[in-house]
Amino acid sequence: MWAGFLAETQFEPLVRNLALQTLAAAGDAWPSRASWAGFAFNCSASWGFLHISLTRLPARAAMEPPDWEHECVEAELPAITELWRARYEPVRLRYEEERAAHAGYPEAFLHSLRRVVVQLEHQGAFAPHPGIRLLVTEVDADTVAEEAELVRVRQAFRMGEAP
């Protein structure tokens, strides 16, 4: 079922594109010589909610859980807010509707977000931000466990498996 959802909604390419546009807009809106120190897909896998969180401060990125300067970037930038509302919200509503019938959706949702982070890394989206901490996380999640899951997806990608 998840494969059908991915194919029909183009979930991963959509999220990747929205993330790239959000990162670009955040860089323009909050220019700084400092690189981003932390990036997260901050989400609720139960409901399909997804936010991008950012910080430029390494100490904040290193906290458990990280303390984001910008907890919900797409809500802070009006043009990006509209973009997310127009493009992501219909997919989220479909996810919420289908999730009730498919117990595996929340874990598949998280795994797809991890795949997108790895794809963004591979594309060089985070190259201007050396040492950036990357996460796919939920509120009150164990960030160490979440990072371990991201490492597994990253390793699969490096071994030639589709991330």
Where are these regions (language model features)?
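Acidic, proline/glycine-rich low-complexity IDRs
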Residues: 1-16, 20, 24-31, 35, ...
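Generic detector of bulky aromatic hydrophobic side chains
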Residues: 45, 63, 93, 105-106, ...
